[in-house]
A protein has these predicted regions:
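Canonical Rossmann dinucleotide-binding motif of NAD(H)/NADP(H)-dependent dehydrogenases/reductases
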Residues: 2-33
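Substrate-binding pocket helix/loop in short-chain dehydrogenase/reductase
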Residues: 99-101, 108-110, 208, 219
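Active-site helix of classical SDR
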Residues: 124, 173, 181
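Alpha-helical segment proximal to the catalytic Tyr-Lys
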Residues: 129, 186-187, 247
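Residue(s) in the substrate-gating loop at a strand-loop-helix junction
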Residues: 157
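Short, small/polar-rich loop/turn modules that mediate ligand/substrate recognition or access, typified
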Residues: 189, 194, 249-251
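C-terminal substrate-recognition "lid" of short-chain dehydrogenase/reductases
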Residues: 227-256, 260-262
Length: 263
């Protein structure tokens, strides 16, 4: 798999986002923009990328994706710097306040929706505004008709495909991401833009503390592969869906969960 052009990654300071940045570089992208609210984590991503792939340009942008003004400014900066956006990985999201619906604080619900749903919507809105202006490129050398202006991959969750108890806000937000993904996959297909979603299950990140892993032991035992996903496995799936190898894949919600959703 070989990718070329400009990539944009949101949540680029987190474990999965950083893996996506490195994944795009590993597969050939030489101009990458990374968005995150945490400037320190974003700088860690920049340093890791520079060490591993010194020839790759990286544009770090600190932005709150729940703010339309900040998203619009961030996308404009990427286009001003690199001239286009060929791949967008909308990966940013926040955690899951536990609670039944009648127990969930409305402010907590609103915060989850503002980042996990509104944030993805805003990113797509301004990414698509740019992509529809771009010239179509032939992305699959074996398929002359595979012409694309861009490709978007949204990070949803296996909890967008099923529900876990006591996660009212988070479950709802990830189902909404899949609704947006499918809608835009249909609406923009004939404009040469594919929109897909990746649905990670339980991912082995620094945020998953050892105590949490022990609490998840019963769940992990239900995963046919009997282990957590690596951030790199999620990243490689995003890179695959982004590129021309997946030129006829559109509107999917692809689990990266070791078979958990089919058990």
């Amino acid at each position: 798999m070989s990718l070329s052009g400009v990539a944009l990654v949101t949540g680029a300071g987190g474990a999965i986002g950083r893996a996506v940045v490195l994944g795009y570089a590993r597969h050939g992208v030489t101009r990458i923009a990374g968005l995150d609210l945490d400037s320190n984590c974003l700088q860690e991503t920049a340093s890791t990328l520079a060490s591993s792939y010194p020839g790759v340009q990286f544009l770090p942008i600190v932005a709150d994706l729940a703010s339309e003004e900040q998203v619009a400014e961030a996308i404009a900066r990427v286009v001003a710097e690199y001239g286009a956006i060929h791949y967008a990985a909308n990966n940013a999201g926040i955690g899951r306040p536990y609670g039944l619906t009648h127990e969930t604080d409305t402010a907590d619900f609103d915060r989850v929706m503002s980042v996990n749903v509104k944030g993805v919507f805003l990113c797509e809105k301004y990414e698509l505004q740019q992509m529809v202006k771009q010239d179509a490129r032939r992305v699959n050398p074996l398929v002359p008709s595979a012409l694309e202006r861009g490709s978007i991959v949204n990070t949803a969750s296996t909890l967008g495909l099923r529900a876990m108890p006591s996660l009212s806000a988070y479950n709802t937000s990830k189902h909404a991401v899949l609704g947006l993904t499918r809608t835009d996959a249909v609406d923009y297909a004939q404009r040469g833009i594919r929109v897909n979603a990746v649905c990670p299950g339980f991912v082995d990140t620094p945020l998953l503390l050892e105590s949490t892993k022990r609490a998840l032991a019963c769940t992990i035992a239900r995963i046919p592969q009997a282990r957590l996903a690596s951030p790199d496995e999620v990243a490689d799936t995003i890179c695959f869906l982004s590129g021309g190898t997946a030129s006829h894949i559109n509107g999917v919600a692809l689990p990266v969960d070791g078979g958990f959703t089919v058990t």
